[in-house]
Amino acid sequence: MRLIAAVLICISTSLQASIEAPGLSDREYRYLTLPNALKVLLISDPTTDKAAASMDVFVGTNNDPKEFPGLAHFLEHMLFLGTDQYPEAGEYQQFISDQAGSHNAFTAPEHTNYFFSLNPKALEPALDRFSRFFVAPTLDPAYVDREVNAVHSEYQSKLRDPARLSFEATKQGLNPNHPFSHFGAGNLSTLQKPGLLDALKRFYENEYSANRMALVVLGEEPLDRLEQIVTERFTEIPNRNLPSSIIDRPLFDTNRLPFVVQSKPATESRRLTLLFPVPDTDAFIDRAPLRYIGHLLGHEGEGSLLANLKARGYANGLSAGESLGMTESRSFSISVSLTPEGLTHRDTIIEEILRTIRLIETTGIDAWRFEELKVISDANFKFEEESDPQNVVTYLSEKLHSVPPQNLFTHGRLLEQFDHQLIQDMLSWLTPEQMLVRVTAPEIEPSETTTYYPTQIHRFPLEKNRLDAFQNARKEVSQIVRLPDPNPFIKAPGEPLPKTRKATIETQPRVLFFSEGALGYVLTENRYSQPKSDIYIRLRTPLASNSPEASIMSDLLSDAINEHLNSMSYAAALAGAGFSAQATQSGITLQFSGYHQSLIPLVNQVLDSLPIPLIDESTWSRLQQLKSQSLARVQAARPSSRLFDEITAELMPLAYSQTELNDAFESIDRQTFHQYQKAFFSGFKTEMFLHGPVSRDEGKALLESWVQRLPIDNSTPDIQVTTNPWSGESIRSYQYDHPDQAATVLYIDTNTDPGSRILNQLAGNLIEAPFYTRLRTEKQLGYITFATAFPLYNTPILTGAIQSPTANPDELADAIQNEFEGFAAMVEAMPDDQFESQRLSLLDQLLNPPSTQGELSNAIWSAIGLRRPFSDRMEQVATLESLTKDQFVAYLKQRIQNPVVLKAYHSNG
């Protein structure tokens, strides 16, 4: 069969030179259509640190048979459990893990996507395994019942998920005859039926076909070699010449509109969303009419719709743009995050939205506005860094079904032609007669509960008197909203910088500014060809986290800074110069990233705006509500996540439990916050880092000018960000409002040197796949099952976690500990080449630089904050280079046999 496939290469069709890629891409591309009609995109990148592949099947939950809702999702699970040439369940997962890789899949309404990434040297054997999913999966009956339970466990884990509950409510306002409105996740009641295996095989044979598939492969090999590897393996996929799987029914039943669906949220949040069906715009995507409209409606600058709603105390945020939709059925949405006051005035908000639409129709369709969007789109495309291999193959494999290969990268990205009439036509669809109104709020009084999720809703046709009022508003021009002026931050970013030879590239920042209370680092950008900078400024003070109250107020202060500067920073962000303030345990970090020419003026303006004015009552009320919602979201998170948060908080002296934070929040009023705000800005230490296209002298001058703008106080006590000492074994028990039970076990290494941290990472890489296979696939303890390594600051930790609908916490913890206690023996029995593959893969990651400028900046800033020497990385390289398997087994035995263990249990009572 391989020989036949190789011969068929000559009749494959290919396209190479005309694929337009982002300006900085050094990758080579080739599009093929194999003889079996499989669409293929090959990407050659000799310098990649990961190879990756994604197969997108143009089949999803929309194609489920009525008798078995969730069957497409169930098939996705089953394909991982053995093929004709690799029949052992878990073999594929183990192979990917052994090559320092990752894998996953997802089932969407129209698509099912399978993907992986791993060590580039292992791409060919990985594709050997991956291809058989689509040629000859075993669909082994022995795994059917077990995997139905896995699907059900996944379904149960998301029963309280806020996004899932809201989505379920939205579906109640859509066309009930469109399968998108139906249940697609699958559970015991929809799948555990007679005839499931036959239905599964029938679905695979009737829906999966090469002509419905698209494959993207990225590797270090030349294109000709990639073509040979792919053609030999994937030409064997059967082409059943199936017709298009697109559902030709409309997503919205226009006869039901206008319609209202109200729902109670899982957390304390309030949102108003208007959904309008609109025509498919793919034929004129380069004119971007909906993007243009969304840009004006969602603008956050002074005088904008959002700014006015905030000023009246009605809203916290607003977004607008193309939204819910299928291939041939689209929608446009305007979504407003409401305050309690805004909820009571939601009709007023709807009327003002409709008046703003009319304002755009009459005075807002301008060529210069389109040109602004075009300039920044062109710049972003020109200077886009190479995307993560796994992300790029997953993204492109779905697009291959509907986008000409030469436009894969430009589709929806580059703007070409201003079309006044087209924008006008799209605006004409945004009318109250064709509107689905979604309201989410705790105050809603429900009349029913949806079938598969505990979503409480109330739905009804929009009342005539309200429709009349909305129709009148749609004819009026807003008298309070002002459309944005020309953006002063939009500047031509220049040309790509010349790439520097590796031997001269700087990899460590230089301390170029040091004074009492201030420390500044500069790294000259000469690796990524970017006319961009990353700038970090930390306002360092114990007031950030020396009590639960301080921790809450530090969060509120960073929110207040973002709020006060939003009108300015939003315009800068549109121009590719981003800013945000974020609270940390050591202070508040001001982070800037973007085109250097636009970024430096932004930094100056932000620093000149500090300290911000004391906030007024209206702003305080909104910030309080947002913080309350944030705390509520933490409490609504799944048990496995909450346990991890609780247990890691115990390990950090400057972190606090959820109960402590909730109590602190309740004790803070505006006057207390004002006192905190004044104290914070009375003085602090600072540390800065500039990574960009500047010389050392230029960088030093900038740092000096920024320090002069800040109230530096060298007497401010310094902060040591570290972990609490721990010993022995400890158990913590919690009880949450969730039907599942959970356990998390942490193995804490008391050695914090660089070598111990990298050995911990290697241990996490080695245990991840077997832990998952035994406890998730074989024992079916729970859908959420994982083991991983992570450093908590400089402390190495191994953790295992399971969330289960059936087992109790003691059983889960015992299962986790049994896996870790057998870990050393497992590695000892492991073939030497398997261990070497993991060791060398991790070593390659250390030796290869980060793939983007932002990743390098973040890594350096993290090291600065943790007071890590920049030489740590080379110490870790030395540890791995000399490491033998016997030495690593001895390390594991010492670590696991004399453990420092912290356990956390959640019981549903």
Named regions from a protein language model:
Residues M1-V7:
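Sec-dependent signal peptide recognition
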Residues I11-S14:
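N-terminal signal peptide c-region/cleavage motif recognized by signal peptidases
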Residues G23-S54:
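Mature N-terminal segment immediately following signal peptide/propeptide cleavage
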Residues A37, M55, H73, Y114, ...:
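Buried hydrophobic packing residues in well-ordered domains
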Residues T47, A52-S117, H182-A185, H299-G317, ...:
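M16/MPP (pitrilysin/insulinase) zinc-metallopeptidase core fold and M16-derived inactive scaffolds
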Residues L81-Q85, S117-V148, E328-E385, P542, ...:
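M16/insulysin-pitrilysin zinc metalloprotease superfamily fold
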Residues Q94, P125-L127, T138-P179, T190-D198, ...:
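Non-catalytic accessory/assembly modules
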Residues V216-G219, R369-N526, L643-W706, I719-W726, ...:
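C-terminal regions of mature proteins
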